[in-house]
Amino acid sequence: ISEALKSIIVG
């Protein structure tokens, strides 16, 4: 579950 967080952080 790191891609989802990265997606939200990146925007």
From Swiss-Prot:
Q: Keyword Cell membrane, does the record have it? A: no
Q: Which GO terms describe its cellular component?
A: extracellular region
Where Glycine amide occurs, residue numbers?
11
Protein localization: Secreted
- Identify the domain of life: Eukaryota
UniProt keywords, alphabetically: Amidation, Secreted
Q: In which tissues is it expressed?
A: Expressed by the venom gland.
Q: Which cysteines are joined by disulfide bonds?
A: none
Give the family from UniProt. Belongs to the bradykinin-related peptide family.
Tell me the function of this protein: Amphiphilic linear alpha-helical peptide that shows histamine releasing activity from mast cells. Also shows low hemolytic activity, but no antimicrobial activities against all bacteria tested (E.coli, S.aureus, and S.cerevisiae).
Q: Please state what the protein is called.
A: Annulatin
